[in-house]
Amino acid sequence: MTELTLQRLKASGWTPGRKVDISPIEKAYAEAGMVMPEKLREFFTEFGFLTIRYDIQHTELERHTLNPVSDFLNYSKEDFEHLFDDYEVFGTAYPVGFAYRGNMTIYYHDDGNFYIFMEPNPLYRCGKTADSLFNGLFGGDKSEWVNLDEETGLL
């Protein structure tokens, strides 16, 4: 992780080896008929329920929330099974949380990658680790991110 990523995570209450009770997240997944992948369970156990806040040039407060429970309120498993098919990313997308005051939704996918979706576009593949996801979100390093709108010609 970049130093900036670590600073922002620690300022939000994260510590290395952090473990939290993710039963509310597991319950939301179960109610939607979804089975949480083990890698995502490990991610939530360490990073779940964090809200990363920071000031951008002292004018704006950015906020990233790692709690997908509200994302399930109006959706079911079927809604997430083909979410990225237009990008030729087939399989199930699992909600992780929100970024930039809700303008972006963070997902984990069957293919082992994290993704960020912005309405109306684009979709970014953010790598297979929390490091690559967080470095791009709030650590100043998007080197592992791929804009799938550009890659697939959907822009």
Describe the function of each predicted region.
Residues M1-N103, D149-G153:
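A surface-exposed partner-binding patch
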Residues Y29, F49-L50, F98, F114, ...:
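Generic hydrophobic/packing signal
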Residues Y108-D111:
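Short acidic-glycine loop/turn motifs at beta-strand connectors
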Residues Y115-E119:
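Short, compact, well-ordered microdomains
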Residues N121-N147:
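Compact, glycine/acidic-enriched structural inserts
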